[in-house]
């Protein structure tokens, strides 16, 4: 099974999906979900609506001997806030059993809906090896499944 990245694709239901590269996967995916539903809202606007700016200085936690500073909120919070503030009805599901997760993904994409997925970047075969690390907060869009695997749009990648 392979995973193919796209730039422009016609979905099973006849709609056209256009890939947009984004500064961050979460805001890019959130923007794509709203565009798919007819609300043409940019990634920077999602960042603002979702309160993406955050600052924290943690002198009591050190990495390589230096205190940690952060400039973004926890993964998923921008999406959650933007969806709530824009009045979106969101269905979220978590799966401990990989097969149940794949079965549900296939069920939903067969209806013609695109699906946002959050997963660990380390295991993504399409992701450049130098960027792989254990981080279970990477987001991308699954468009549909074909005979070779899944067609996806990952806003963190150029195409």
Language-model segment annotations:
Residues 2-98:
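Cysteine-nucleophile protease catalytic domains, especially the papain-like/related folds used
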Residues 37-61, 65, 98-149:
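Active-site-adjacent substructure of cysteine-protease-like catalytic cores
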Residues 145-159:
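Noncatalytic regulatory segments and standalone regulatory/sensor domains
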Residues 71-82, 121-131, 152:
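Short, surface-exposed, charge-dense and proline/glycine-enriched linear segments
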């Amino acid at each position: 099974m392979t995973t193919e990245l796209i730039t422009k694709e016609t979905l099973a239901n006849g709609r056209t999906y256009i890939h947009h590269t984004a500064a961050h996967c979460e805001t890019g995916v959130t923007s794509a979900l709203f565009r798919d539903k007819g609300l043409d809202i940019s990634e920077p606007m999602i960042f603002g609506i979702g309160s993406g700016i955050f600052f924290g200085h943690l002198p009591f936690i050190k990495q390589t001997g230096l205190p940690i500073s952060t400039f973004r909120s926890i993964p998923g919070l921008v999406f959650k806030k933007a969806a709530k503030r824009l009045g979106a009805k969101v269905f979220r599901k978590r799966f401990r059993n990989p097969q149940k997760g794949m079965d549900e993904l296939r069920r939903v994409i067969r209806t013609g809906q695109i699906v946002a997925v959050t997963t660990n970047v380390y295991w993504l075969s399409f992701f450049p090896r130098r960027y792989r690390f254990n981080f279970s907060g990477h987001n991308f869009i699954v468009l549909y499944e074909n005979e070779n695997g899944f067609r996806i749009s990952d806003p963190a990648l150029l195409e």
